[in-house]
Amino acid sequence: MILPFLVLAIGTCLTNSFVPEKEKDPSYWRQQAQETLKNALKLQKLNTNVAKNIIMFLGDGMGVSTVTAARILKGQLHHNTGEETRLEMDKFPFVALSKTYNTNAQVPDSAGTATAYLCGVKANEGTVGVSAATERTRCNTTQGNEVTSILRWAKDAGKSVGIVTTTRVNHATPSAAYAHSADRDWYSDNEMPPEALSQGCKDIAYQLMHNIKDIDVIMGGGRKYMYPKNRTDVEYELDEKARGTRLDGLDLISIWKSFKPRHKHSHYVWNRTELLALDPSRVDYLLGLFEPGDMQYELNRNNLTDPSLSEMVEVALRILTKNPKGFFLLVEGGRIDHGHHEGKAKQALHEAVEMDEAIGKAGTMTSQKDTLTVVTADHSHVFTFGGYTPRGNSIFGLAPMVSDTDKKPFTAILYGNGPGYKVVDGERENVSMVDYAHNNYQAQSAVPLRHETHGGEDVAVFAKGPMAHLLHGVHEQNYIPHVMAYASCIGANLDHCAWASSASSPSPGALLLPLALFPLRTLF
């Protein structure tokens, strides 16, 4: 129930808020709806081509509330009110919901979810590339329970494959593409318990270089996990935390180079200048590690040393598209999640906007005729925005009212829990006395926690390209890679494409149509 004085205050604020002149005319809304209807009717002609290429964009922690807030921010960055803005992912014709729970967790983590949307099976919290028979931290439950990913399926089919992330390349999301680990935190052997080492388990950085030796493109952070203990970092020479971590003395970057065929062109780069100086037409393998740990937030990024996510995606695509058999590319906007965990909504939302820019870049470099693009999140966060804000209100601004309990203002953005819980003189902090628009401002939270938590609600799945219509309702998260594999005729779906081709010799554009009409359960 809204109290009368709040109704009056809100009503006055909304009456005085900005309304674009064109939106006062009913014909504007009718014309907009008719255009949307025409586009929807075109979807009756399904794209049943074979997906030569697959691009998966994963916004770590990019729940629906984050998508909406990022949409408003993107518009406001272009000096618009924001609400009417369309993200690149908003333009995708097919949208579904994904159920994100892990096999042992109602509210999931990024490791178990990555195993689901990359390997096609749900798994326990904290484990990557293994089934639910593997228990977290228990190395001896790993063997025999490994599961492979769509990156492996694509490579086995002769496609080029790549990983681009704003986290370290051995973090939860990318690691499920190539590793099998009972613990997502085993970044190098330095983070592993003696028992796990004695039982023969390998750290995730080691597995990156050894499990699938011919990953064509790897870009992100994580340099320190590749070098021997205390090796000085090339960029942060005086920072002890940036030094190498490996206890086994291995130089994994040298090992990566040694695995590449001599007649191929392989390049290791560690800064933006080196990356952009490359001629992608003369690059067969690329390893780019731009930070000792995770990459910098987009708002903090050094333009000389750190490439943007969009720049990494562009270089990756120029390399991968050279393969006539196509490619699979995993792109992670991984620091959306970190911003939320720290209660720094401005950092998180700018990360989401940058990922949307990368989605747009990929769209200009590929075609929906032969490229399936899927955008989704692994999980949500307890992030929200509300308070009856008027149209065009800064997404980082104050709500147009004060609390009817403590008589203090509050920001539109709030968290259910996290580090933003602050008490001053026994009362909730008065946010009008702080710089709530600061890049690192921690939005207020209801419950005090050092790190804000994930949310358990469903997340959106956006899809365009061949067979995108198979993402159409509410799905288990592990369904996603099965759709991508089906569209591309790889993995468990290799045979059905061969059968369709030999049975009727259809044109490439119609290759999957006969099978697209059968229930998917008959194919797996």
From Swiss-Prot:
This is Alkaline phosphatase, tissue-nonspecific isozyme. Gene3D superfamilies: Alkaline Phosphatase, subunit A. Zn(2+) 2 binds at D337, H341, H454. It comes from Rattus norvegicus. Keywords: Biomineralization, Calcium, Cell membrane, Disulfide bond, Glycoprotein, GPI-anchor, Hydrolase, Lipoprotein, Magnesium, Membrane, Metal-binding, Mitochondrion, Phosphoprotein, Signal, Zinc. The keyword Zinc applies. Its EC number is 3.1.3.1, 3.9.1.1. Alkaline phosphatase that metabolizes various phosphate compounds and plays a key role in skeletal mineralization and adaptive thermogenesis. Has broad substrate specificity and can hydrolyze a considerable variety of compounds: however, only a few substrates, such as diphosphate (inorganic pyrophosphate; PPi), pyridoxal 5'-phosphate (PLP) and N-phosphocreatine are natural substrates. It catalyses: a phosphate monoester + H2O = an alcohol + phosphate; diphosphate + H2O = 2 phosphate + H(+); pyridoxal 5'-phosphate + H2O = pyridoxal + phosphate; phosphoethanolamine + H2O = ethanolamine + phosphate. N-glycosylated. The gene is Alpl. InterPro entries: Alkaline_phosphatase, Alkaline_phosphatase_AS, Alkaline_phosphatase_core_sf. The modification Phosphoserine is found at S110.
